[in-house]
Amino acid sequence: DSILTAPMKSVCLNGTFVEPAKLADPLSMLERNHLFQRIHTFGGTAPFLSVHLEILTRALDRLYGMQTDLSESRIADRIARLLEINRFPRQSACVTLRLFPEGIDEGSDRCEYLIETDRPLLYPHFVLWHKRMMLDTVRCDAPHEGYPTAAALLCDRYAERTVRRRGGELAARESRDGVLLGVGGEPLLIVSG
């Protein structure tokens, strides 16, 4: 996703900062099985990092029967440093933490992680806002629905492309039973009244 499109000076691979151009083919990386979390940062820090790491840890255990030793303080430090290196605004940004249970390269025998800056966010704090959009739904179930997997990411991309071809702006993915699953890879938040 963003490895392919976002201009970055550096990414963090297993705690080491490297230039994206020095990575193996980014497209093949995204095609490998991986779990991910998009993390909103404020003031250069990730305020709910422990929750994101817990989600990844649980998913890794349930889907792969593996444990991880991701240190919250080390990941927090790497996120802050990565935002600084890539000159992201201090107010609000989004980073993606990807966990590759089978490693990034063929033949790897260990779980690896990648942190990348995703995009600056246009609001300074948690804000509810609205925009009138043309929304359309696409039926597409991902294996292990509800977990942040590469398959779910590909299903979201498929839904977005399908809706754009139909002339819409935003894709809501739904299950074969008609249950809304999310919009653009993000959970749904509905406010009524």
Residue ranges and their predicted role:
Residues L82-F88:
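Phosphate/pyrophosphate-binding loops at sites that engage ATP/ADP/AMP, CoA/4′-phosphopantetheine
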